């Protein structure tokens, strides 16, 4: 299995190198995806301004979190993030029943995230109140989001989410395997992985003129570096039914990317930002899909570009949590407040590269 994964990762590297010239075409479109944006309790406490009110979202400052990847967002035409928490229910809380200050969502929007994913196993952590609060806050922000809905009619109308990007129509479909055993108030409140429903939504995407269909499943087994048999089954099912790209989340570690044109599958982007520190949970992937127009007017995937990231926790690299591209920071140990975090990053990154022959 590891040998197969190595071949897959090498195939991605080779295709990126061979197709580099494609990215210069005027009809090129770039979509960036980041993994799980978590809101553990220590993250919120680190963002709380000195003397701030814990129940006042304006007293939280998340500006440090995205600053070292902002240039990647700026270079993209569209940025997608998995926002793995209900938003705005006080008192704010971390694991196991999350509720994040809306200032985290506002900061994500400010730095260039264009689409929030909400169908994940924590969306029901605060019950119907949390779903409604998340819906209202994101709607007032004016940021597109997908995965939760307020009525059956709205689910039909807004699922998939259709985004117009540089004149192309891209369909985004976000599903979750479940909600940690918590009840979903109504079947249409949260998109769940169900074969018949998934097929229906993919069909809607094509009927509504999608030039590219992207599925964003919340799936898999936590902390497993290789995709499960169920993930592979679903990936095959999605592609056979009309999905061009699959970009997954939930395992909290990075899993392989497979690019066999015309399809691309990223099984898990891992954590983008969290308080987790177990082996491999601080390594994430910022994934860029480079797309080009076809003679038929649709989009095809020309390149898959992974950027591996490291989530540095409070008082490690900086005073607050921040996410950095690993390769940009190799050799800069002196800049860390706590050198042990640099050493941990290098150690885990070297082991990760060795395991997957990067």
PLM regions with names:
Residues 1-9:
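Bacterial N-terminal signal peptides that target proteins for export
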Residues 13-22:
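Hydrophobic h-region of N-terminal signal peptides that target proteins for export
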Residues 24-358:
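Acidic, metal/ion-coordinating pockets
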């Amino acid at each position: 299995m590891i040998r197969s994964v190595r071949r897959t990762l090498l195939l991605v590297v080779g295709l990126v190198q061979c197709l580099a010239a494609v990215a210069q075409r005027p009809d090129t479109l770039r979509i960036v995806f980041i993994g799980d944006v978590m809101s553990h309790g220590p993250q919120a406490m680190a963002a709380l301004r000195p003397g701030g009110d814990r129940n006042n979202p304006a007293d939280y400052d998340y500006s440090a979190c995205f600053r070292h990847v902002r240039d990647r967002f700026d270079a993209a035409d569209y940025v997608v993030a998995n926002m793995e928490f209900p938003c705005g229910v006080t008192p704010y809380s971390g694991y196991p029943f999350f509720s994040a200050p809306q200032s985290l969502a506002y900061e994500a929007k400010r730095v260039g995230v264009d689409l929030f994913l909400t169908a994940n196993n924590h969306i029901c952590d605060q019950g119907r109140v949390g779903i409604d609060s998340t819906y209202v806050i994101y709607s007032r922000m004016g940021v597109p989001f997908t995965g939760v809905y307020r009525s059956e009619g709205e689910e039909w109308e807004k699922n998939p989410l259709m985004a117009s990007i540089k004149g192309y129509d891209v369909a985004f479909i976000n599903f979750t395997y479940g909600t940690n055993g918590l009840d979903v108030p109504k079947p249409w409140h949260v998109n769940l992985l169900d074969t018949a429903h998934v097929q229906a939504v993919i069909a809607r995407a094509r009927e509504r003129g999608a030039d590219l269909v992207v599925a964003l499943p919340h799936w898999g087994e936590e902390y497993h570096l290789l995709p499960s048999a169920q993930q592979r089954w679903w990936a095959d099912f999605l592609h056979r039914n009309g999905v061009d790209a699959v970009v997954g989340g939930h395992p909290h570690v990075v899993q392989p990317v497979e690019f066999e044109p015309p399809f691309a599958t990223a099984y898990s982007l891992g954590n983008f930002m969290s308080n987790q520190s177990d082996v491999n949970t601080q390594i994430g992937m910022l994934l860029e899909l480079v797309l080009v127009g076809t003679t038929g007017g649709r989009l095809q995937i020309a390149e898959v570009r992974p950027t591996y990231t490291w989530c540095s926790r409070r008082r490690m690299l900086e005073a607050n949590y921040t996410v950095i591209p690993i390769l940009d920071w190799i050799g800069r140990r002196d800049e860390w407040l706590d050198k042990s975090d640099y050493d941990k990053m290098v150690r885990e990154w070297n082991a990760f590269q060795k395991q997957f022959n990067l």
